[in-house]
Design a protein with these regions (language model features):
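Structural transition elements
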Residues: 220, 347-386, 403-406
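N-terminal lobe/hinge region of extracytoplasmic solute-binding protein
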Residues: 48-102, 213-215
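Gly/Pro-rich hinge or "lid" segments in bacterial periplasmic/extracellular proteins
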Residues: 164, 180-248, 253
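Surface-exposed binding/hinge segments that line
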Residues: 110, 127-129, 140-201, 224-226
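Long beta-strand-rich cores associated with HINT superfamily self-processing modules
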Residues: 531-558
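Extracellular/periplasmic solute-recognition and catalytic clefts
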Residues: 223-234, 255-318
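Alpha-helical secondary-structure segments
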Residues: 123-133, 174-181, 218-219, 249-253, ...
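Extracytoplasmic/peripheral linker and loop segments enriched in polar/acidic and small residues
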Residues: 170, 423-432, 462-534, 558
């Protein structure tokens, strides 16, 4: 998953890891009881954001921020209960976590009775079927690839707008839905925690404009939505706590305000005056502020640092930068110390040398391009010499934030030392990923980040590096390197067919090394997510699945 710390990902951490991240203090704003007494009712939570969401349409959303917000609006077949010491997979719309059969190629879910939309009508299995079928429509795009990859007939299905249904999704009755898969997927019920595995009533589907008209079956519904300005959520009066094991409905509403400078958001929350006391930021702390705020003792109770086994990286377009020697030279030339400084220093994360993060099944520690995070300029120049001393000009795409632009400056400085001219192209943060995921883009270098959709390498490497998916997803391509290496593709297929977890993880480790041998990406940092809340905001817990502060139990202190 993605996003400016906003892309995907779904990572479960141990309780000890979370406590370390919060400074080993249970008095941090990490739970209702620890943040000032029992949850109260009423009040409005203000959410401050630099940019609008790429999408809220549940079948299109594939960012951490969008997925976090969708948790308030839509319910999924399964979900994560994070009130205990570790996240627990539970039924959400479904009564339980599903039943596999036929070697995990068939999954059956039974829906709860009495789950209501915002107009009081009941959620049904055909609504979920229709919602999942929307994944396949070319009229809407941007979401994760799993439905197309795993559902029988998915490779040829064009979505419900063409007037046809997908036969591999069956609804034998009003409350039962059955998925037929083309391969065994033992963790399919973790896939169904993602927003797209939710109900969309056909009568309220507005197609490409559904982003601003999402029909709610969660505790909050969209009252008004002015893109790039403000999203206002109000209570869904037909939502029932008795049917929802995950969420609460404590505040009266939520106002998301877009378009504020990232550093201005930091300083507003830090000052804790007026409405800032009942506000939380949903944009990461600016790199220029992070070191100071992370080490300010007075902010400890309001500061959230969430380790997220995810990766911040520089993708090299292998179809544009075709010479592997030049790509290898870039690997050695990048100074990760200045790059990390742009993102906020050590508080942002550790230096990365692999695409799989520690904590992800399949991670293997290795470093193909030297131990010095500052790079190896001599080696980089030697590789450029072997490539014939070209003097290429390359474009780099980044979000239009000070943090990202400082990062681009660091890349530009590093590469110009080896004769590469770098042209920086800032892209509006609200449309950044939809722009770079379009295969018509002309960028040589692209900043990206990724968090596993759940803690398995299957949600990282195949999505980011299966070159066979590029043509299938021309407007939602996640392979920013445009890598289509037969060796990598073969390893992806091998891993998918390997039932033994240890052997499968070994294959993913081998795959990670091959991708780095291809010099398709420069891994930069294993990321942390850092954000703050006002002093009157309670009930915030670190969502170690979406890697955002969770709002499902949030309340305003009286």
């Amino acid at each position: 998953m993605t996003r400016s710390t906003r892309r995907s990902r779904t990572v479960a951490l141990t309780a000890s890891a979370v406590m370390i991240a919060l400074g080993a203090t249970a008095c941090g704003g990490s739970s209702g009881s620890s943040a000032g007494g029992a949850p109260g009712k009423g009040g409005t939570l203000t959410i401050l954001d630099k940019a609008d969401f790429d999408h809220l349409d549940p079948q299109r959303v594939y960012t951490t921020e969008g997925q976090s917000m969708d948790q308030e609006i839509v319910r999924t077949l399964t979900g994560w209960d994070e009130t205990g010491s570790t996240p627990k997979l539970v039924g959400d719309l479904a009564t339980d976590t599903g039943t596999p059969s036929k070697g995990a190629t068939v999954w059956t879910f039974h829906l709860r009775h009495g789950v209501k939309y915002q107009d009081g009508t009941e959620v049904t299995a055909p609504d979920v079927k229709y919602g999942v079928e929307r994944f396949f429509s070319s009229d809407i795009n941007g979401g994760p690839p799993y439905a197309a990859q795993w559902l029988v007939g998915g490779s040829d299905y064009k979505g419900p707008y063409k007037g046809k249904e997908l036969g591999s999704i069956q609804t034998p009755d009003k409350y039962t839905i059955v998925f037929h898969l083309n391969q065994p997927v033992a963790d399919f019920n973790e896939t169904t925690t993602m927003p797209g595995w939710s109900a969309v009533p056909k009568s309220h589907d507005t197609g490409s404009t559904y982003d601003t008209h999402v029909w709610s079956d969660g505790p909050y519904m969209i009252k008004s939505y002015t893109k790039n300005k403000e999203l206002v959520l109000a209570r869904n009066t037909h939502w029932s706590q008795a049917t929802d094991p995950i969420r609460q409905q404590n505040v009266d509403g939520m106002n998301v305000r877009f378009g504020q400078d990232e550093s201005a958001i930091d300083q507003q929350i830090k000052a804790d005056a007026g409405t800032a006391q009942t506000s939380i930021q949903q944009w990461p702390i600016a790199g220029s502020d992070l070191a100071q705020l992370a080490n300010d003792p007075s902010l400890k109770i309001r500061y959230y640092k969430i380790p997220a086994p995810g990766i911040n990286y520089l993708a090299i377009n292998t179809t544009r930068v075709k010479n592997p020697k030049v790509r290898q030279a870039i690997e050695y030339a990048i100074d990760k110390t200045t790059v990390r400084g742009a993102f906020g220093g050590s508080a942002y994360g550790d230096y990365a040398t692999t695409m799989l993060s520690p904590g992800i099944g399949g991670y293997r520690k290795f470093n193909l391009y030297g131990a010095n995070p500052a790079g190896n300029l001599a080696k980089a120049k030697e590789l450029m010499k072997q490539a014939g001393n070209p003097k290429p000009s390359m474009s780099i795409a980044v979000e239009n934030t000070p943090t990202e632009e400082h990062f681009a400056d660091a890349v530009k400085t590093a590469l110009e030392r080896i004769g590469i001219t770098v042209n920086i192209t800032p892209i509006d943060a609200s449309s950044y990923f939809s722009t770079i995921n379009n295969t018509k883009n002309q960028y040589d270098l692209t900043w990206g980040d990724w968090i596993a959709d759940w803690p398995n390498a299957s949600t990282v490497l195949p999505t980011l590096f299966d070159g066979r998916l590029i043509k299938k997803n021309p407007q939602a391509n996640q392979d920013l390197s445009y890598l289509n290496d037969p060796k990598v593709n073969a390893l992806i297929d091998k891993a998918a067919k390997t039932a033994d977890v240890k052997q499968r993880n070994a294959t993913y480790g081998q795959m990670d090394q091959q991708i780095l041998k291809d010099a398709a990406v420069v891994p930069l940092m294993y990321m942390n997510f850092s954000e703050m809340a006002g002093s009157k905001v309670g009930g915030v817990i670190p969502d170690t699945i979406v890697a955002e502060p969770s709002l499902v139990h949030v309340y305003i202190k009286k």
